[in-house]
C-alpha cells in the first residue's frame, strides 16, 4: 500500500482468542517466555531478526502455520505476496516513556522519498502474554511528503492492552508504537512478548531479513 491508502484508524480491529487453542498452546510451549527472556538477557537482536514467508508456498514451520491460521481473519487482498514477521520483546520497565517509539512500518528503512515508500497492506500484532502496561498504540497519523507524521499531533489514538492470544490488525500506513508505564505505579518487571505480522504487496529490503524457514535455528529452538 502507498501513502495514498484511504483506510483509517476506524479499520483497526481486535480479536480475542484469535488462534485455535491448540495452536496457541503449541506456540507458547515451543517458544516459552523463559526462552524469550534468556535470549533478551543475551542481547539477542529481536528487532533486527525478521523473516519473510511468501504466499506462494505451503507452511513448513509452526510459525508459518500460525500465520496461515491468521490469514482468514486478515483476508489480505490478491496484491499481498507474503508476510514479514518478527518477535517484539520488551522489558516493561525499561523506560517509563515509550517502550517502542511511534514509527511507520515500511518496505525500505533507508528510503526517504515518500513517493517510493510502500507500507504493508495490513500490520498486525499477536500478543503472547499479559503485562500491566505496554499497550500497542495506533494513531490516526499518516506520513506526509516530508517523511513526517501528519497531523503533527494525533487527533485520535487507540490503545490495545496485551492479552494472551489477542490479535490486533490495522492498516499498515498508520503511525504506531508501544507505551510504557507513564503515570502508572511501577509493577514487577516482565517481558512483553508479541509476534508482529505484516502482510505486504512487496518484499521488504532489510538486509537482515531471513527466510522464514530459518526461524527455528535463529532462535535456537532445535
Annotated model-derived regions:
Residues 1, 221-222:
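Non-catalytic N-terminal targeting/anchoring module and adjacent flexible stem/linker
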Residues 79-84, 88-180, 185, 189-196, ...:
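Catalytic core of non-heme Fe(II) oxygenases with the double-stranded beta-helix
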Amino acid at each position: 500500500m502507498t501513502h495514498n491508502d484511504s483506510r483509517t484508524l476506524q479499520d483497526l480491529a481486535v480479536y480475542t482468542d484469535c488462534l485455535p487453542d491448540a495452536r496457541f498452546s503449541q506456540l507458547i510451549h515451543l517458544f516459552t517466555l523463559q526462552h524469550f527472556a534468556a535470549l533478551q538477557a543475551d542481547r539477542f537482536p529481536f528487532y533486527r531478526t525478521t523473516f519473510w514467508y511468501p504466499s506462494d508456498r505451503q507452511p513448513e514451520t509452526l510459525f508459518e502455520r500460525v500465520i496461515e491460521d491468521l490469514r482468514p481473519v486478515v483476508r489480505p487482498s490478491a496484491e499481498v505476496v507474503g508476510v514479514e514477521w518478527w518477535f517484539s520483546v520488551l522489558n516493561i520497565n525499561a523506560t517509563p516513556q515509550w517502550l517502542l517509539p511511534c514509527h511507520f512500518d515500511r518496505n525500505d528503512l533507508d528510503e526517504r522519498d515518500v513517493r517510493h515508500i510502500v507500507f504493508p497492506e495490513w500490520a498486525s500484532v499477536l500478543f503472547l502474554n499479559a503485562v500491566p502496561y505496554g499497550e500497542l498504540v495506533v494513531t490516526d497519523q499518516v506520513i506526509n511528503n516530508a517523511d513526517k507524521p501528519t497531523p503533527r499531533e494525533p487527533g485520535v489514538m487507540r490503545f490495545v492492552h496485551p492479552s494472551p492470544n489477542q490479535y490486533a490488525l490495522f492498516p499498515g500506513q498508520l503511525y504506531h508504537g508501544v507505551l510504557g508505564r507513564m503515570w502508572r505505579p511501577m509493577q514487577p518487571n516482565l517481558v512483553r512478548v508479541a509476534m508482529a505480522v505484516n502482510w505486504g504487496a512487496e518484499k521488504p529490503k532489510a538486509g537482515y531479513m531471513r527466510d522464514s524457514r530459518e526461524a527455528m535455528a535463529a532462535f535456537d529452538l532445535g
